[in-house]
């Protein structure tokens, strides 16, 4: 599956972030904002990527492995990271462009993040609910 940078500068999309390409990271940070300083808490609890837009779902379906994911809080939003085989993919989001929905599913709780170009469903253990809610509030504002 090709994930070439075909969208306009600053457009939300799925990025292959495996390699240290400064131009690619500049575009990712143009969307989500720069990383927070090292002394600020910026990582989410561990999440499982369950579903996503067609682009994300095609990658998730490539292997039967559990797709662990995490969110990194940035100055203006967050970046979702997940791995497929040896590649690391990311979806940057800008605060204000995201709609958040919470739900329950069997033994897990789920978080759905909706944006214009990318939608994902993430699962986490119910015991992590407060930590995930705090992260989402810090990254995307009150929901």
Regions from the PLM with identified roles:
Residues 62-105:
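Phosphoinositide-binding peripheral membrane targeting modules
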Residues 2-63, 97-143:
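Acidic, Ser/Thr- and proline-rich intrinsically disordered linker/docking segments
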